Amino acid sequence: MVSVYLLANFGGPRHASDIEVFLTSLLTDRDVTGKFLPPFIHKRLFSFIAKKRVAKVLPQYNCIGGFSPIYRDTEDLADTLSLYLDAPVITFHRYLPDTHQLTVQRLKAFGDCPVIGVPLFPHFTYSVTGSIVRFIHAHLPLLNISWISHFGNHPQFIFCMIDHILKFLQSHDISIHDCCLLFSAHGLPMRYINKGDPYNKHCEKSFKTISERLPNIETHLCYQSKFGPGRWLTPSTKDVCETLKTDKTYVLIVPFGFTSDHIETLYEIEKEYIPILKAREYRALRVPAIYQSPEWAASLATIIQSTPRAEKESLIKP
């Protein structure tokens, strides 16, 4: 029996009218923003916050072309993966609710075929990968599905990341001896880490492996995109950009954990962090997300075919 693959990603606004719907879907997800309020109050509060945030983020999306490329990138990647895997690849965009019905219908159409879920996040967190798993099992409880929970330390991911970075350096005529790399991952509240979320450990292990294979390059791990009050993982990317002391001419920010470019890379890194470094007289550049690597689709196919599967029980936080 043929396997079916479910390629799951964050989703992102395809146009301006998607922004409020996207933010509402994201912020009302209790796996993301927490379970400290009763569900009905949580939904009302974060729906209000999402509506208020539109005015802030709309100019940011306008600055990067009016949309997020993550939707199109995921669809294109699914088409390419289908050729490598010689099997159907269905997409799931977690925070684009008007796409969910089609995903569910397409999965149902394959009946009892085994499904392999592939969230496009190298490092596991209950807040993102766990949310995807929870959603699919809630809407398709009888689906015969297992999951690739993370792949940030898979040899093929490590190879592809290093190859992508070195080719970027070569294309910009930058010596490995004269650059510093800031690996910027999405942040996470410390209250989640303190409750056992393994995200930071996965990030640190992946970063350590890559750094060991780049022995002649100065590297730092940092975290971006803090939202709301409370302590988050540190150091923050902004703080590192403001306080970094290196004798290297070039400082490159590498999206780490972001497999596709979207507002966190195209705006937050490019328009907020890169200027900080340039103001401090570093030659600063943003490395594109790994999706831009010509090796990525083939590498991901290898990762999918060689990674042990996980069941939902280990991926969902009660």
From Swiss-Prot:
Compartment(s) of residence: Cytoplasm
Entry similarity comment: Belongs to the ferrochelatase family.
Annotated Pfam families: Ferrochelatase
Recorded GO CC terms: cytoplasm
Function: Catalyzes the ferrous insertion into protoporphyrin IX.
GO molecular function, one term: metal ion binding
Catalysed reaction equations from the record: heme b + 2 H(+) = protoporphyrin IX + Fe(2+)
InterPro entries found in the cross-reference section: Ferrochelatase, Ferrochelatase_AS, Ferrochelatase_C, Ferrochelatase_N
Annotated protein name in UniProt: Ferrochelatase
Keyword flag Metal-binding: yes
UniProt keywords, alphabetically: Cytoplasm, Heme biosynthesis, Iron, Lyase, Metal-binding, Porphyrin biosynthesis
Any single GO BP term: heme biosynthetic process
Pathway: Porphyrin-containing compound metabolism; protoheme biosynthesis; protoheme from protoporphyrin-IX: step 1/1
PANTHER family: FERROCHELATASE (PTHR11108), FERROCHELATASE, MITOCHONDRIAL (PTHR11108:SF1)
Catalytic activity, EC: 4.98.1.1
Main location: cytoplasm
Ligand binding (Fe cation): H186, E264
Major enzyme class: lyase
Keyword Metal-binding belongs to the record: yes
PROSITE patterns, alphabetized: FERROCHELATASE
